[in-house]
Amino acid sequence: MGPLTPFRERRFLACFVTGTLAASGNWMLSLSVPYLVYEMTNSTSWLGVSAVASNLPALIASPLGGVFADRYSKRALLLISGGIQVVLALTLFAMSRSGALDIGNLIALAIAMGFASSTQTSVYQSFVAEIVPARQISAAYRLNAIQFNVSRAIGPAMAGFVLHRWDATTAFLLNAIAFAPLLCVLAVIGTRDVTRSVATSVIGEIAAGALLAWRDHRLRLAVLIGTLCSMFGMSIYSLAAGLAKDVFRVDEAGLGLLVSSVGIMSFLTAILAVSLGDRLKRSTLVMSGLVIYGLGLWIVAATDIFVVGMLGFGITGVAHVMVNVSVTTTVQTYVPPEFRGRVTSFQLMGIMLALPVGAQVGGLVADY
């Protein structure tokens, strides 16, 4: 089986293309919101607050999404969560255009978007396994890493262009539009039959998933590594708006390029990871990725030269893929199908909760 075999499945290909567009819209939003926050407040501490607002809902939404994903149709859950995100993006657009959007409203809507996005992310990660044959699951998740990183390259670049050419209001509208193709695909595709968990109590099901993830050392280590990398590595992306303006002295287009450098290098690394398949041990990739993460962060911290800063951001993108693809593939390979949604949600919850903690600490230190 070749590394691109999952693309022969029309369902996977359709979700890959439209999911990339929707994720690009989300990345554009994730840059536009902190940009607008910084424009309103001129404070890196508020950037940390916006990161907390966007990611803290994962504490509730991610495990609930995991439980629902194991109980119910993942396709239906994705349609609902995607529809909610469209409504919220249109609300941001309408309030921004009318001049009614202030920092309080923006943070409140960021929290609501965080709930919807966290639910969708945890459900989509486990949904991939239902649109390819079981033997293609590992290859599909490697390709899914390409989807994530293509969108991370396109989204910030689009945001930089839109913010420079127009404003955040336009970015909010484009985010809503970007979801339409994925919702259309989800409305018509079918999925393969999988084992579903028997509904008991929500808390009991969350506890059962947590117990499984903790007792299996492979799953436990994967979740912990992803969490720590998010706290000490990925959190720097939430501070990009402040770094671009105050350290590197660049405008909106420069901010887009700074964050896109992460996506571009991540994309190239993801292609290499897909082509290599299982020829490199996942443990080797993770350990190497952790070292490279430290190198990239050190470069960003040590310079005020924009091009060098882009290099540092790009290096963290290489490291992120090396760690994230290995961690995600490990989780999806070893988790039982009836627990896939819950264990995946714990992995994502760790990443999403650690990110704002790191961003908040970084923002406070930067202001100090």
Language model regions located:
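Hydrophobic core of transmembrane alpha-helices in multi-pass small-molecule transporters
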Residues: T20, L101-T119, T227, V308-M322
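Transmembrane alpha-helix termini and helix-breaking/packing motifs in multi-pass membrane transporters
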Residues: P34-M40, L92-S98, I154-L174, D246-V247, ...
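MFS-fold secondary transporters
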Residues: Y38, T91-M95, M113, V185-L186, ...
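C-terminal transmembrane bundle of multi-pass solute transporters/carriers
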Residues: I60, L64, R71, L77-S81, ...
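Helix-loop junctions on the cytosolic side of multi-pass membrane transporters
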Residues: G99, S126, E130, A168, ...
